[in-house]
């Protein structure tokens, strides 16, 4: 999908905050939205949290009308949803880069429609920037890797010899055709598949998946883990839905991908 050039605009206040947190700065401390268990596992995996990073984009999502009786992608809306997320992600990566981080873990992508304007939505990307104790873990583009895996899954991934390259995503906003009255009446009271609806949902998910896979291929990934397939209605009404696919692209660091077998643990209680 073609998009406009992504412009990373970071507020001055954010840059001052990042400068204070940068490793080596006087009184530097880290911030993180990881849980205690996740934080300790990320440290065990050989990474040190350096700061909470975020990116935001307030985006006006325009209007595109689908044909009443037709299944069709609303490509302008697909591009808008994709581009807005890309802006937020890029600004988050820019903050991580300012901290000298090698990657961002536990990334969350959220959308919140605002009441102070019609069709205005804030796209937010937030995660914990981390720096490796040894070596460089940046991707082939020289950017910090991004991952939406939990701290536990990130630890397991690294322990088994894989490296995250980046979050990859695909979006498809699709208009699902209305069922004509004669067909709807003919199906009344019957158990029967509705091929028009089946084809619409199938096609929309496939488009989202294929776009996510194309992003993974661009990163020279071996695979994508933790994939989520989401159906998001937003505010467009019952027959227009965004199908969104997202996951973490990975590649192998070594041929051996075994993990230690779990051990037996006995509690020291009488319950």
Give, region by region, the residue ranges found by the protein language model.
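Short, well-ordered alpha-helical segments
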Residues: 53, 67-108, 168, 173, ...
């Amino acid at each position: 999908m073609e998009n406009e050039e992504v412009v990373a605009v970071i507020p001055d206040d954010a840059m001052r905050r990042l400068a204070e947190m940068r490793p080596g700065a006087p009184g530097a401390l880290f911030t993180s939205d990881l849980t205690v268990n996740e934080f300790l596992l990320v440290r065990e995996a050989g990474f040190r949290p350096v700061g909470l990073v975020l990116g935001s984009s307030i985006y006006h999502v325009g209007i595109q009308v689908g044909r009443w009786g037709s299944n069709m992608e609303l490509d302008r809306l697909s591009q808008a949803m994709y581009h807005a997320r890309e802006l937020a992600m890029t600004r988050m990566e820019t903050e991580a880069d300012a901290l000298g981080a090698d990657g961002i873990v536990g990334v969350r992508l959220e959308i919140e429609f605002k009441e102070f304007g019609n069709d205005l939505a804030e796209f937010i990307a937030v995660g914990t920037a981390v720096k490796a104790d040894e070596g460089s873990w940046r991707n082939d583009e020289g950017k910090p890797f991004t991952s939406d895996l939990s701290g536990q899954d990130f630890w397991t991934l690294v322990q088994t010899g894989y490296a995250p390259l980046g979050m990859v995503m695909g979006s498809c906003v699709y208009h699902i055709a209305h069922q004509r009255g004669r067909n709807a009446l003919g199906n009344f009271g019957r158990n029967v598949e509705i091929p028009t609806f089946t084809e619409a949902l199938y096609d929309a998910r496939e488009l989202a998946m294929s776009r996510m896979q194309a992003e993974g291929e661009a990163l020279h990934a071996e695979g994508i883990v933790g994939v989520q397939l989401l159906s998001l209605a937003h505010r467009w009404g019952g027959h227009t839905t965004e199908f969104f696919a997202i996951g973490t692209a990975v590649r192998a660091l070594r041929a051996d991908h075994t993990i230690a077998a779990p051990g037996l643990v006995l509690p020291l209680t009488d319950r």
